[in-house]
């Protein structure tokens, strides 16, 4: 999985709110 806007999938829930995993 990767961040929807690019980069690796965030590890922490609060970061996933900013950059969801796709």
From Swiss-Prot:
Keywords: Acetylcholine receptor inhibiting toxin, Disulfide bond, Neurotoxin, Postsynaptic neurotoxin, Pyrrolidone carboxylic acid, Secreted, Toxin. The keyword Zinc does not apply. Disulfide bonds join 3-21, 4-19, 9-22. It is found in: Secreted. It comes from the Eukaryota. The modification Pyrrolidone carboxylic acid is found at residue 1. Its main location: secreted. GO terms for cellular component: extracellular region; host cell postsynaptic membrane. GO terms for molecular function: acetylcholine receptor inhibitor activity; toxin activity. Expressed by the venom duct. The cysteine framework is III (CC-C-C-CC). Negative results: does not inhibit mammalian neuronal alpha-3-beta-4/CHRNA3-CHRNB4, alpha-4-beta-2/CHRNA4-CHRNB2 and alpha-9-alpha-10/CHRNA9-CHRNA10 nAChRs. Belongs to the conotoxin M superfamily. Probable competitive antagonist of fish muscle acetylcholine receptor. Inhibits postsynaptic nicotinic acetylcholine receptors (nAChRs) from fish (zebrafish and goldfish) and frogs (IC(50)=0.1 uM). Protects these receptors from block by alpha-bungarotoxin and alpha-conotoxin EI. Does not block nAChRs at the neuromuscular junction of Rana pipiens. Shows a weak inhibition on mammalian adult and fetal muscle nAChRs (alpha-1-beta-1-delta-epsilon/CHRNA1-CHRNB1-CHRND-CHRNE and alpha-1 beta-1 gamma delta/CHRNA1-CHRNB1-CHRNG-CHRND) (IC(50)=3-45 uM). This is Conotoxin MIIIJ. It comes from Conus magus (Magical cone). The lineage of its organism: Eukaryota, Metazoa, Spiralia, Lophotrochozoa, Mollusca.
């Amino acid at each position: 999985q990767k961040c929807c806007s690019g980069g690796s999938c965030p590890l922490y829930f609060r970061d996933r709110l900013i950059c969801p995993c796709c």
